[in-house]
């Protein structure tokens, strides 16, 4: 696995700045200290930019602060006091001071300090804050240190890393003797606590470093994972460096070199990040990634510097994670010792069990027979009691991986084993997932290497391409489990209908395999999967299905979210693309898994309702036949009769009902369900129809809260309502805009809270009052523009306005792609009203920082827009959505 920084420019080492960090022998006042600190911080940036290694600069800052604190200690008279010492702890104790790292100090005394000395310590610490040093400190006696350390793991860890700066050497050595004694956090207890702490930390980051805004220090595979190894080794073995761990036999020299390389690469990124910030933080947030990448000399156009940097970062964290898990196991064996149950038990001629971990019986097997690597993972799939790979076997696997002469998929037995894994229940979670974690998926199929660590610079994708793909596979596997029913009932019913589930898994493996390769990744991925299918012996029908799924992976998602799926013609066109119910079953399962695995917040009841609606409508169309589409009048009658049946149960006035319905146009009945029609009618019959009425559904309708508005129609009504909903922080996902024959607006909005849930009950009255005030206003006043969300300011989405082909001359379909921004719908509505254009429907889709909306519009006389008006709309919308000042 290559980890060279191939997209960086080497620095010019010919003119490195001179270190200003020499403390004056006299004139040691606050202003002098602050000036020298500022000069030193500037030098750190200049030195880093000139090519001096981060580890040298970290060492230089540590030494610089050491000298300052030692000088201050003497200057203020502490040097002559016995039984007191100044001790560096935490990261400072390790000697790991980045530009913005906290300076953690312990003022250690044998007995409680007299009030006068305690006051003097407080005054001197205040001076450090005055000169803008981020100092964390504690003042403790030896006894207090030990008591605090025994009760608090973080205090104990800080003490284990302690380093004497100046003061009573004997006192410090006494502290060291106590904290490394068996009575102070015995090795077994410390090891177990640190492993639990690491597991908890990993869980906070969803178990992966592959979140696209990772924490360089705390994400899985980050610096903390290396620190954890160092802490455990320090406590148990007394090892103060990776070199000493080699001496104890717990690291090979190659592993030591690899960990050092990873450590220095992570230091380099963290150092550059700190130079770009004013306040301590270790998160590579989107708005920082470009400047950090440039500082690290990554090159390329547009977002390429970011993608190259993050790819290097993610590949480093992958290596750290694997080494961390392997060494944790080795520590466990050494510290906790094997129990009788953990003695090896044979599985077959090749493998044995140590506890619940699979282990090699012959250390040379993977080198002699590379296909045995796949045999091991298939054994893990077939035996659900195996929870992982034994540490020494991981070491042999890593060694064999580096000595492979060809991809594993070129070995016939390996191909057979790989397909067997895909066909086996649990084959993904127990086989492909660990293969991915140990870089064997990369070794098996060469295409996988291109997407490992591949990020996309947007707010839509939460994970790298490889991590997303693995999550798609795991989501698909979950459709076979009964516990998934509450969240995905339909897909659970469909899964058993897939005649060859392994085919959808192959399609999932390849659906994003060509991301970042240039060109349409769906087309390129379909070409790649054809080669895979041929190599693995799939028959013609199976090959065609997986290639079709990869090629059309976005078809259902785009149709459901960005097309008018209540239009029979749209359903017919979609059904013509799908062709068979079998394809439909595969496609809907892949689509749902893809959405769920893209971003944890992306899947909601609204998207589920859209996909269900499209699925059932397409299923009906396929069973009916392509030549038969439902007649509009037939659909109107059907919906009216079903709604009437519901209303008759309540003894409504049918004559009054028909008077209301006679005012409505046919589209109103087609685009609402019978339940919606009955709900509207039930309330309209009790209402003075000359006055506005606002209804908010108490139960989710089509996955969201339905807001129904009855009001005299007027220009800018849609813009005004949209502005009010935006002001209330509601997301509009669908709008149906109707006008009765006598000029009353009957508008329906499906809205969700920002977290994707229906409107919370405690907000209903507030929303209703706000809308009532909006309807009472006679004229339209555009709202004052709100500031754009901070995250969005770092993204750019060119506004695109496209008119889609249509089968009718009575309406136009406008597709809008733009940067998400406050008040977008209101601005769109204002443009339509300015141009005298009627809005009949809207489908609103927000994908991260990007909106992809569909608007159904017509002229005032209910005709499609001509070319001239289309051009005017394009120009006005582009101007409205690209203001010079984004706030």
Curated annotation (Swiss-Prot):
GO terms for molecular function: [protein-PII] uridylyltransferase activity; phosphoric diester hydrolase activity. Keywords: Hydrolase, Magnesium, Multifunctional enzyme, Nitrogen fixation, Nucleotidyltransferase, Repeat, Transferase. Residues 347-705 are annotated as: Uridylyl-removing. The keyword Magnesium applies. Residues 1-346 are annotated as: Uridylyltransferase. Residues 1-24 are annotated as: Disordered. PROSITE patterns: ACT (PS51671), HD (PS51831). One of its GO terms (biological process) is nitrogen fixation. Disruption phenotype: Cells lacking this gene are unable to uridylylate PII and are altered in adenylation/deadenylation of glutamine synthetase. InterPro entries: ACT-like_dom_sf, ACT_dom, HD/PDEase_dom, HD_domain, NT_sf, PII_UdlTrfase/GS_AdlTrfase, Polymerase_NTP_transf_dom, UTase/UR. Residues 465-587 form the HD domain. It comes from the Bacteria. Its EC number is 2.7.7.59, 3.1.4.-. Uridylyltransferase (UTase) activity is inhibited by glutamine, while glutamine activates uridylyl-removing (UR) activity. Its cofactor is Mg(2+). The keyword Metal-binding does not apply. Belongs to the GlnD family. This is Bifunctional uridylyltransferase/uridylyl-removing enzyme. It comes from Klebsiella oxytoca.
